Amino acid sequence: MAAISTCQTVIPLPIPVFFNQQFPTLVDICARWQLVFDADAPFELRFESDTLTLHKRDEPKLDGIVVDFVTGAVAHRRKFGGGRGQSIAKAVGLKQGVTPKVVDGTAGLGRDAFVLASLGCTVIMVERHPVVAALLEDGLRRAYQDAEIGDWMRERMQLFHGSSLEALAKLEQEVDVVYLDPMYPHRDKSALVKKEMRVFQTLVGADLDADGLLAPAMALASKRVVVKRPDYAEDLAGVKPSMVIETKKNRFDVYVKSAMK
């Protein structure tokens, strides 16, 4: 398996999952992320066609959850998604001559981080849940090996497995922008959102500590903090942003500390 740019801080408690114990690759992945076999666990990890997938065992009709930076929706968005004219690009301050270094403090499946990296940003993805981090690492491994995007992916995207943004201070790296997208109850009933929200909410639970992310994010970012919210959500931690960029269903609350240069 190719080496992945991954940093780890706190050692999490072992997380129970179901997996094929006769498959050495799965055994290695689970050992690396301290995932322990449990015959009654609600989630199963599979490794098929060189890809790690997560399955909710009581909903077998659901497709597996996978991190894929090479094909599918994220690849289409990279090629046809509007480039630096996208709202997320404006929110983080991307402009001619400015490609900020970004920490995505709530990486999830890494889609927003990938958009920013594809536009030239260097992005460190922070993910605290070991199962999600394992999926991200597998997605990075395959992306790093891809002939089309592998070179710049290795340069621009890293994974940091830690329990909070405060741990990132130990990296001693200057960060221009911290990007946050805390899990929030979605009203969208599309199949994709329903599937992923069902899986994620069961797996990781709600971001009950989301309000506590703003202060360490502001301390870490030298230029700005960007918070992605559903259009109906309240301000994070009750703090009014410096400016708001609205999209059809979401908004980006921007907390400016200094000008982008």
Curated annotation (Swiss-Prot):
Query: Source species, please?
Result: Shewanella sp. (strain ANA-3)
Q: Upper taxonomic classification of the species?
A: Bacteria, Pseudomonadati, Pseudomonadota, Gammaproteobacteria, Alteromonadales
Q: What is its main location?
A: cytoplasm
- EC numbers listed for it are 2.1.1.242
Query: Family, per the entry?
Result: Belongs to the methyltransferase superfamily. RsmJ family.
State the compartments where it is located. Cytoplasm
Identification of the protein by name? Ribosomal RNA small subunit methyltransferase J
Task: Tell me what reaction this enzyme catalyses.
Answer: guanosine(1516) in 16S rRNA + S-adenosyl-L-methionine = N(2)-methylguanosine(1516) in 16S rRNA + S-adenosyl-L-homocysteine + H(+)
The alphabetized UniProt keywords are: Cytoplasm, Methyltransferase, rRNA processing, S-adenosyl-L-methionine, Transferase
The entry's function note states:
Specifically methylates the guanosine in position 1516 of 16S rRNA.
Show the InterPro entries listed in the entry: 16SrRNA_methylTrfase_J, SAM-dependent_MTases_sf
- Molecular function (Gene Ontology), one example: rRNA (guanine-N2-)-methyltransferase activity
Q: What residues does S-adenosyl-L-methionine bind to?
A: R111, D112, E127, R128, S163, S164, D181
Q: What class of enzyme is it?
A: transferase
Q: Which Pfam families does the record cross-reference, listed alphabetically?
A: SAM_MT (PF04445)
